[in-house]
Structure formats: C-alpha cells, structure tokens
C-alpha cells in the first residue's frame, strides 16, 4: 500500500516541481491531473489505499484552476461511499505574487478534505518574520493552513525559492508522519 500520495495539477511546470518536492518529503507517489482535469483510472485505487493525500495546485485568479476543480468534483463518487473517511490530508499552492490570494486555494483544499471526513494537517512551522529573514528561510511566506509557494512569473520552475521548496518537503513529511501514526 502506498502510504502517501501527492495529487496535483501544474499548468506551467512550477507546481510539478513543488509536487516533486512534496513527494520527496513524504516519500509519496505522484499523481498528475492532466490538462483535461483527469487522472489515470489506476490512480483512484492508489488514492483509496493511501493513508495520507496531499493536494497541490497553482492559484490562478484567486482560486485553483478548473482542472483541479474537475478532479475535486470527480471525488464525489468517493464521498458518496465515504471511501476517504479518516484519511489525513494536506495541501500546497503557488502563485506568481507573494500573496496572490493563495489562502483561497488552501481553503478549497481544506474544505474538500473535510467533505470527505478527512483530517487536515496544518503546516506546523513557525513563520520566518524577522528583519533578518529571507526567501531562503523556512515558511518565509508565513503560512499556517498549508504550504505556500511563490513562483516568479518571468522565470521557470528552477527559480522557485529554496525556502519554499524546503517548507513543502518538511510539511509533506509531517502529513505523511501523522498519517502513519493515525493508521498504525
């Protein structure tokens, strides 16, 4: 059984890099939502067997893109039979701006997990909020609900700040660890 799964949509490659960091931190399987908002049929079984699931999506125009929302709506067949009841969930999002209304995307993911009767894991990392803080610091965007990432709009995925990627790794490891503890 795969203990942790990262399911994500990436429009321009930035979220894919973040999802890979999350998978590394959680030692998780990766499931990519395609450009039509679908996942492979076998991926549904992988999600069903997981102890913990991390959602990932960019924030476009103040929320998740339609491809992630289509996936979220497709989970209703799991909701109907309470397939994901008591699973552990977390989520991450990125946008080009430091704020970019990313919190809305995390709240959507949190709500989706709650609809399924899941247990949402907070970030659990103190913010880097002193005058000496930099973008290389852990949780330099000051998140608490989940992981936030800023991806420069004029650069490729390699330009994502190291502090953001490390924050995602640590958070994903926390989600997976709590999933293992609750389902031991």
UniProtKB/Swiss-Prot annotation:
GO molecular-function terms, A-Z: FMN binding; NAD(P)H dehydrogenase (quinone) activity
Flavodoxin-like domain residues: 4-176
Top-rank taxon, per record: Bacteria
UniProt-listed SUPFAM superfamilies: Flavoproteins
Annotated knockout phenotype: Cells lacking this gene accumulate higher intracellular ROS levels and exhibit decreased tolerance to H(2)O(2) toxicity compared to wild-type siblings. Inactivation of this gene also produces a moderate but significant decrease of 24% in the intracellular survival of P.aeruginosa in phagocytic cells. During in vivo infection of Drosophila melanogaster, flies that have been fed with the wild-type strain of P.aeruginosa die faster than those fed with the fldP deletion mutant.
UniProt protein name: Flavodoxin FldP
Annotated source species: Pseudomonas aeruginosa (strain UCBPP-PA14)
Binding of FMN, residues: 10-14, 91-147
Biological role stated in the UniProt entry: Flavodoxins are low-potential electron donors to a number of redox enzymes. FldP protects the cell from oxidative stress and reactive oxygen species (ROS) damage, thereby expanding the capabilities of P.aeruginosa to thrive in hostile environments, and contributes to bacterial survival within the host. In vitro, is able to mediate ferredoxin-NADP(H) reductase (FNR)-driven cytochrome c reduction.
CC cofactor: FMN
Swiss-Prot/TrEMBL keywords: Electron transport, Flavoprotein, FMN, Stress response, Transport
GO CC field: membrane
Induction trigger: Up-regulated by oxidative stress conditions through an OxyR-independent mechanism. Makes part of an operon that consists of PA14_22510 to PA14_22540. Is repressed by the LysR-like transcriptional regulator PA14_22550.
A Pfam family matched in the record: FMN_red
Gene expressing this chain: fldP
Family: Belongs to the FldP flavodoxin family.
